[in-house]
């Protein structure tokens, strides 16, 4: 193991030079996309060069015009940085206590928090980031009137049962959209339940292919998670069944239609423990989602506003 670490370190230093610092983030796709938004802000200020960014999704960065070095996540690289006395920045926007199941959020939007932790100052855009080639975008057009629906987040690396919305309601949403003449595509993990009547692409796309499909879709309807962030990164309008677990101001986007439930216990920031039978999700009916989706489809072609913040 030591020999491997030494060989890895020598190879990286020879190829990329001495790092100014090493940056790592959470394991989720959405977290990585929000990190990409913060890195973009670092890059436009000319301060991304010389930084090693550790990624669990290398394909997100191929290609990229951003400065910096993007390396597959490896704890050996962190150990190397520590031996070289290079700063290691561990990005995060909450502190999770497994004993209480409580995810205590840091103040502000996650992208703003990441920017602050990276030393970015001034006006920033609260938008995740991915670059697609024209050929990739063209490949995302699968059907004439395509919309994307995600009916579960159970396939996430850190699944949160408090985000669950009943499967039968998702099936009714799918039926209504198909009744409107739309081609409903289901994206997500093969571990998630099939959506009745949808074109099933669960587990059959890469992250970049999913991004391209979203980029060429009229609408995304889904839950808080990686696909929500991916849709925002490619400017796909979205209706998000948010519920009440968290405030959209933490990691959501004003460009989306965010459907929230606000019982007295909300926001709770629990991951799996709900003593109230997910009342915040139950408050959102399928008619609410269908109405919101139809409203967004009627506004097709509108330029999506970009949220901003100022980091002091």
Residue ranges of predicted features:
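Catalytic machinery of carbohydrate-active enzymes
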Residues: 1-312
């Amino acid at each position: 193991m030591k020999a491997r670490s030494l060989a890895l370190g020598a190879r990286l230093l020879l190829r990329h030079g001495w790092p100014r610092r090493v940056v790592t983030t959470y394991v989720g796709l959405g977290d990585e996309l929000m990190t990409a938004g913060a890195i973009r802000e670092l890059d436009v200020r000319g301060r991304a060069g010389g930084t090693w960014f550790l990624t669990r999704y290398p394909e997100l960065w191929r290609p990229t015009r951003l400065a910096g070095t993007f390396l597959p996540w490896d704890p050996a690289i962190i150990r190397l940085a520590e031996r070289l006395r290079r700063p290691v920045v561990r990005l995060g926007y909450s502190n999770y206590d497994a004993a209480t199941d409580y995810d205590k959020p840091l103040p502000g939007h996650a992208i703003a928090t990441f920017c602050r932790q990276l030393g970015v100052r001034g006006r920033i855009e609260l938008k995740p980031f991915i670059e697609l080639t024209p050929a990739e975008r063209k490949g995302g057009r699968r059907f004439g009137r395509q919309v994307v629906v995600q009916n579960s987040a159970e396939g996430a690396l850190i699944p949160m049962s408090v985000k669950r919305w009943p499967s039968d309601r998702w099936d009714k949403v799918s039926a209504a959209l198909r009744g409107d003449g739309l081609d409903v595509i289901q994206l997500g993990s093969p571990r998630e339940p099939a959506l009745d009547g949808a074109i099933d692409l669960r587990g059959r796309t890469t992250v970049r292919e999913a991004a391209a499909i979203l980029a060429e879709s009229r609408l995304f309807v889904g839950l808080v998670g990686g696909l929500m962030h991916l849709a925002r990164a490619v400017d796909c309008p979205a209706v998000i069944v948010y519920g009440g677990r968290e405030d959209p101001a933490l990691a959501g986007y004003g460009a989306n239609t965010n459907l929230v439930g606000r019982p007295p216990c909300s926001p709770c920031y629990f991951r799996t423990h709900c003593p109230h039978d997910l009342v915040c999700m139950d408050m959102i009916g399928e008619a609410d989602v269908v109405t919101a989706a139809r409203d967004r489809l009627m506004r097709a072609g509108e330029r999506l506003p970009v949220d901003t913040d100022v980091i002091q």
